[in-house]
């Protein structure tokens, strides 16, 4: 099956999961079957899917953006999804508040814009690096991140082409950890 046909099938499958509010697991590394993300599909187009992420411990965990082309398999309504749904229910978890998505806006751009407007930490992954920090500048082609160190301090400006970003997270527990460290308080997390 060609890559384009496969991506079209994936979009159709994910659209059904979104319409029926099915908790899905998206596998993104064919070499590592344990490399997947789980959650409810918040937004979907032919380029990206945004999940309202659910952690393996049954807690809502921000949002994660994945390129549709990188999804090697999607599974919904399996035992793992049922387990996560039960944990969400028993814990009384409430969904993460949505972020704004403007009409026709690129999803990655929207995620970066929301992080910038709220002064929040975002994580961007390229093929070679992971960038954790606050958005300093954003345009249609690039994002400049104040990349934080291990202690959430000493931001170093790094500019990344949006087309090079393979995944992004916003509002996840890891992002919040850096927000707490950089602010010295947990007021947002």
What spans do the regions from the language model cover?
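Short beta-strand-centered aromatic/proline hotspots
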Residues: 35-42, 131-137
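Short glycine-rich, low-complexity segments
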Residues: 1-36, 54-129, 149-189
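N-terminal "domain-start" segment
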Residues: 34, 44-49
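Short aromatic-glycine-enriched beta-strand elements
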Residues: 47-52, 142-146
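Residue-level recognition of beta-strand microenvironments
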Residues: 44, 74, 138-140, 168
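Viral structural modules
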Residues: 1-2, 136-139
